[in-house]
Regions:
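Conserved N-terminal phosphate-binding loop of PLP-dependent enzymes in the Aspartate aminotransferase
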Residues: 1-453
Length: 453
């Protein structure tokens, strides 16, 4: 074990003790929660927070939140992207409250739906849209429709991808074979009939899989995000688009996380041309909402294939999809919050965050790397930027992750629990970024022994 690892274990024990001492009320609620909630949390992912129990929140506004023990935090997790808008932006709160008094869900169209569809067309260039409650649903529906109009059974995803809880995407490569992703709960779907997997940025592997001509669609983020940010190599997107077109395979881009690249996502920023596009989380400022869009040609094929009398039992859609409350939140978010001016500020803050972390890494000569995509920043425990999902996965270190997250949390800074990710919101300030930089510098100073514990 390295000296850094040994120090990390010692520091983690100290930080765990400090966390429990400073959060007595959260500890009480965590104990009570075990009597009514599975694993003691409302959604089992929340066990991933770095302490012995999660902090219980009381209120959140802008880029900060306060817990039940009265401690205030700078929030760089922002609901793991759902609150990339900042918590409870005033225009969204106001318009949602007004709409709530007029109706929540009707199973009828609203003018809000038209406005949102038109705005998504303006931003992403796709002329037809549908709505869902979550980005997982949007991805699932897009895959089903791709299978419908192509008559092909399989979806291709990239190794270590993330597209929510879509069964077909919970797969990785092991010795060249497609297997269920580690941690997948229950028996997996029959991956040999549903899924192909290729390494990100590997054009030869992508071509080999697509030439089987049994793939309905490629579902991918424009850049991998959930295993750490993995950028496309120069020319990769051109090759991806050329190969999908030549093999008559639909290309679906999932912009749920990569919306961090700008108001029109990575797609607009880099002029990509998907057949379908999905987006969720932040578009409603954290109110459950998602959308999926189509080119005119794909939309025509879908409309021709869907029977009106059976449309409600076809496996696409849902009772709450397109509800007027969610669409009001999306309209207010797109019109007033996630604007071009806001993204300009958010991306500048992301650059400042990146510089601060990289300077601290360089100052202590650590073999780590920081990567940024728009207003999203992550650091990995490897010396250079990853090229594939496998590169990023191999850099994972649960001990260091937990220590750095807990060290920051104990000093009033919240990072995303699943990886070392930070998001900038319209409400984030330079002082917030600098607070993280100072905490991170202290943490690596203690890890390397250059700062006394």
């Amino acid at each position: 074990m390295s000296v850094v690892q040994t120090r990390a274990e010692t520091l983690l024990e100290r930080e765990l003790d400090r966390f429990e001492e400073e959060h007595p009320r959260s500890a009480e609620l965590a104990k009570r929660a075990r009597s009514s909630l599975l694993a003691g949390v409302p959604m089992h992912w929340m066990v991933r927070w770095p302490g012995a129990f999660p902090v219980f929140a009381v209120e959140a506004q802008g880029a900060r939140f306060r817990d039940v023990d009265g401690i205030e935090y700078v929030d760089f997790c922002l609901g793991d992207t759902g609150a990339m808008t900042g918590h409870s932006p005033e225009p969204v709160v106001r318009e949602v409250a007004e709409q709530a008094a007029r109706g929540l869900t009707l199973m009828l169209p609203s003018e809000e739906a038209l406005w949102v569809g038109e705005e998504l067309t303006r931003r992403f260039g796709l002329p037809r849209w549908q709505f869902a409650v979550t980005a997982t649903d949007a991805n699932r529906f897009a895959i089903r429709l791709a299978r419908l109009i192509t008559g092909r059974p399989k979806v291709l995803v990239f190794n270590w991808c993330y597209h929510g809880t879509v069964d077909e995407t919970l797969a990785t490569l092991r010795d060249g074979r497609v297997v269920a992703r580690e941690g997948n709960l229950g028996p997996p779907v029959p991956l040999d009939t549903t899924t192909r997997v290729a390494e990100w940025n590997d054009v030869a592997a992508l071509q080999r899989e697509l030439e089987q001509r049994d793939i309905a669609c490629v579902l991918t983020e424009p850049a991998l995000t959930n295993i750490g940010i993995v950028h496309p190599e120069v020319g990769f997107h051109d090759a991806l688009r050329e190969l999908t077109r030549s093999t008559e395979t639909l290309l679906i881009l999932d912009e749920t996380h990569t919306l961090c690249a700008g108001p029109d996502g990575y797609t607009g920023a880099h002029g990509l041309e998907p057949d379908m596009l999905t987006v969720g989380k932040a578009i409603g400022s954290g109110i459950a909402s998602a959308a999926y869009g189509f080119t005119g040609e794909v939309a025509a094929r879908v409309e021709a294939a869907i029977g009106r009398d059976e449309s409600d039992v076809g496996g696409v859609g849902g009772t709450l999809a397109g509800n007027v409350l969610s669409l009001t939140a999306v309209r207010a978010t797109l019109e007033h919050v996630l604007t071009e001016d806001a993204f300009e500020r958010m991306i500048a803050l992301g650059e400042r965050f990146e510089r601060g972390v990289q300077d601290a890494i360089d100052e202590h000569s650590l073999p780590w790397h920081v990567t940024r995509l728009g207003c999203r920043v992550e650091y990995l425990f490897r010396p250079e930027r990853p090229v594939t999902g496998s590169d990023a996965a191999a850099a994972g270190d649960h001990l260091l992750d937990r220590l750095i997250h807990l060290y920051a949390l104990n000093r009033g800074v919240l990072l995303t629990p699943f990886h070392n990710m930070a998001l900038m919101s319209p409400a984030t300030s330079e002082a917030d970024v600098d607070q993280h930089t100072a905490v991170f510098r202290d943490a690596v100073g203690e890890l390397t022994g250059s700062r006394p514990s």
